């Protein structure tokens, strides 16, 4: 199905809220996913998979010289943290022992206007962001893999280009809608007595 950038961004945002993710994270993730979809990359299915496999745990972070090492991480938590560390320009390398979505990490780099943002799997370049442009190796399909971020200049032969339409798989859209509906308050005696329209304050 075809949708607009705003429609998709709102759906991802509401799906995140429905998954009990903080508002600030939902804002960043929804923008990153919608931006990647503008370029024809299947980020919506990717974020749905991430939402369904949420696990809340303490960050396992090691700082060694100018390197930060995360353990097994999720892009919506450790990925955002890693990007924040990268933007300080204090560290030469950010390493994830395992990251669930390198693609969405690239999207986060893109919307945050980072420069010389080089993402590698082992020694292979899989993505690069610089000056509001990005390259993504579409032959790379790995998830839950070791990832490192380095601030290094790289000469890209061709950056990804914007597509004319955003096309989303109908099943992915439906699954995201189901998550987004979790933000609706179920009808109950409590909600009728104390919710909007209960005449508790002057605005009801």
Range-by-range predicted roles:
Residues 137-204:
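Extended, charged low-complexity segments
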């Amino acid at each position: 199905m075809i949708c607009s950038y705003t429609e998709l961004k709102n759906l991802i945002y509401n799906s995140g809220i429905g998954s009990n993710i903080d508002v600030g994270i939902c804002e960043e993730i929804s923008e990153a996913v919608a931006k990647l979809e503008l370029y024809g990359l299947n980020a919506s299915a990717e974020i749905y998979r991430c939402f369904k496999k949420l696990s809340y745990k303490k960050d396992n972070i090691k700082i060694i010289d100018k390197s930060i090492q995360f353990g097994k991480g999720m892009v919506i938590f450790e990925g955002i943290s890693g990007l924040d560390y990268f933007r300080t320009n204090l560290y030469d390398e950010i390493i994830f022992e395992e990251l669930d979505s390198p693609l969405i990490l690239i999207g986060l780099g893109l919307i945050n206007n980072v420069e010389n943002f080089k993402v590698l799997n082992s020694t292979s370049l899989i993505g690069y962001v610089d000056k509001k442009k990005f390259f993504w190796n579409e032959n790379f399909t790995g998830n839950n893999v070791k990832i490192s971020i380095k601030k290094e200049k790289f000469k890209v032969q061709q950056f990804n280009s914007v597509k004319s339409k955003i096309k989303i798989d109908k099943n992915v859209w439906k699954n995201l809608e189901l998550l987004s509906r979790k933000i609706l308050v179920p009808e109950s005696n409590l909600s009728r007595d104390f919710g909007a329209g209960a005449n508790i304050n002057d605005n009801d």
